[in-house]
Amino acid sequence: MLTVHLEDLVFHAHHGVYSGESAVGNSFQVSLSVSYEEEKIKLNDLKNVINYEDLFNIVKKRMAVPMPLLEEVAESIIRKIRHEYANIKKISITILKLNAPIEGIHGKVGITLSKKFD
Protein backbone atom coordinates (compact mmCIF):
# COMPACT_ATOMS: atom_id res chain seq x y z
CA MET A 1 0.00 0.00 0.00
CA LEU A 2 1.23 3.47 -0.91
CA THR A 3 0.21 6.56 1.07
CA VAL A 4 0.36 10.14 -0.18
CA HIS A 5 0.57 12.81 2.54
CA LEU A 6 -0.19 16.51 2.53
CA GLU A 7 0.71 17.93 5.94
CA ASP A 8 -0.07 21.21 7.67
CA LEU A 9 -1.63 23.05 4.71
CA VAL A 10 -2.97 26.43 5.84
CA PHE A 11 -6.07 28.09 4.36
CA HIS A 12 -8.16 31.12 5.23
CA ALA A 13 -11.79 30.04 5.05
CA HIS A 14 -15.27 30.91 6.29
CA HIS A 15 -16.37 27.78 8.14
CA GLY A 16 -18.19 27.96 11.44
CA VAL A 17 -21.56 28.13 13.11
CA TYR A 18 -21.12 31.61 14.58
CA SER A 19 -21.90 34.66 12.44
CA GLY A 20 -18.47 36.17 13.04
CA GLU A 21 -16.76 33.02 11.79
CA SER A 22 -18.66 32.96 8.52
CA ALA A 23 -18.23 36.71 7.98
CA VAL A 24 -14.59 37.25 8.95
CA GLY A 25 -13.24 33.75 8.46
CA ASN A 26 -10.46 31.94 10.23
CA SER A 27 -7.21 30.14 9.55
CA PHE A 28 -7.40 26.37 9.18
CA GLN A 29 -4.67 23.74 9.06
CA VAL A 30 -5.37 20.64 6.96
CA SER A 31 -3.47 17.34 6.87
CA LEU A 32 -4.47 14.59 4.47
CA SER A 33 -3.37 10.97 3.94
CA VAL A 34 -4.58 8.96 0.96
CA SER A 35 -3.67 5.25 0.63
CA TYR A 36 -4.00 2.98 -2.39
CA GLU A 37 -2.70 -0.32 -3.73
CA GLU A 38 0.30 0.21 -5.98
CA GLU A 39 1.43 -3.34 -6.66
CA LYS A 40 -0.13 -3.61 -10.14
CA ILE A 41 1.08 -0.29 -11.52
CA LYS A 42 4.39 1.22 -12.53
CA LEU A 43 5.45 3.97 -10.15
CA ASN A 44 7.66 5.76 -12.65
CA ASP A 45 4.88 7.69 -14.40
CA LEU A 46 2.74 10.47 -12.91
CA LYS A 47 -0.39 9.21 -14.67
CA ASN A 48 -0.15 5.95 -12.68
CA VAL A 49 -0.01 7.49 -9.21
CA ILE A 50 -2.17 9.80 -7.13
CA ASN A 51 -0.80 13.27 -7.75
CA TYR A 52 -0.45 15.33 -4.57
CA GLU A 53 -0.96 18.53 -6.59
CA ASP A 54 -4.40 17.24 -7.63
CA LEU A 55 -5.17 16.41 -4.00
CA PHE A 56 -4.08 19.89 -2.93
CA ASN A 57 -6.37 21.50 -5.52
CA ILE A 58 -9.34 19.42 -4.35
CA VAL A 59 -8.72 20.46 -0.74
CA LYS A 60 -8.23 24.10 -1.75
CA LYS A 61 -11.50 24.22 -3.72
CA ARG A 62 -13.51 22.53 -0.95
CA MET A 63 -12.02 24.76 1.75
CA ALA A 64 -13.23 27.79 -0.26
CA VAL A 65 -16.88 26.70 0.09
CA PRO A 66 -18.26 27.98 3.42
CA MET A 67 -19.82 25.27 5.59
CA PRO A 68 -20.93 25.46 9.22
CA LEU A 69 -19.19 22.30 10.48
CA LEU A 70 -15.67 20.98 9.89
CA GLU A 71 -17.16 17.48 9.74
CA GLU A 72 -19.10 18.52 6.64
CA VAL A 73 -15.99 20.04 5.06
CA ALA A 74 -13.98 16.85 5.68
CA GLU A 75 -16.76 14.64 4.31
CA SER A 76 -17.02 16.73 1.13
CA ILE A 77 -13.25 16.51 0.56
CA ILE A 78 -13.26 12.74 1.04
CA ARG A 79 -16.24 12.30 -1.33
CA LYS A 80 -14.54 14.37 -4.05
CA ILE A 81 -11.21 12.54 -3.75
CA ARG A 82 -12.94 9.16 -3.83
CA HIS A 83 -14.92 10.26 -6.90
CA GLU A 84 -11.70 11.23 -8.69
CA TYR A 85 -9.69 8.17 -7.62
CA ALA A 86 -11.74 4.96 -7.39
CA ASN A 87 -8.70 2.85 -6.40
CA ILE A 88 -8.29 4.54 -3.01
CA LYS A 89 -8.42 2.22 0.00
CA LYS A 90 -8.21 4.74 2.85
CA ILE A 91 -8.47 8.49 3.36
CA SER A 92 -7.81 10.36 6.58
CA ILE A 93 -8.19 14.11 6.92
CA THR A 94 -7.59 16.39 9.89
CA ILE A 95 -8.91 19.95 9.87
CA LEU A 96 -7.83 22.25 12.69
CA LYS A 97 -9.22 25.70 13.42
CA LEU A 98 -6.21 27.78 14.43
CA ASN A 99 -8.06 30.59 16.23
CA ALA A 100 -11.23 29.15 17.71
CA PRO A 101 -13.68 31.74 19.06
CA ILE A 102 -13.63 30.22 22.54
CA GLU A 103 -12.75 32.54 25.39
CA GLY A 104 -9.51 31.57 27.10
CA ILE A 105 -8.45 28.89 24.62
CA HIS A 106 -4.84 28.95 23.46
CA GLY A 107 -4.39 26.22 20.90
CA LYS A 108 -6.06 24.49 18.00
CA VAL A 109 -9.40 22.70 17.83
CA GLY A 110 -10.59 20.40 15.09
CA ILE A 111 -11.62 17.02 13.78
CA THR A 112 -10.18 13.96 12.06
CA LEU A 113 -12.31 11.88 9.70
CA SER A 114 -11.03 8.55 8.36
CA LYS A 115 -12.75 6.27 5.87
CA LYS A 116 -11.80 2.87 4.45
CA PHE A 117 -13.00 1.55 1.10
CA ASP A 118 -13.08 -1.95 -0.40
Model-predicted regions and their roles:
Residues 1-118:
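N-terminal, polar/charged subdomain of small-to-medium soluble alpha/beta proteins
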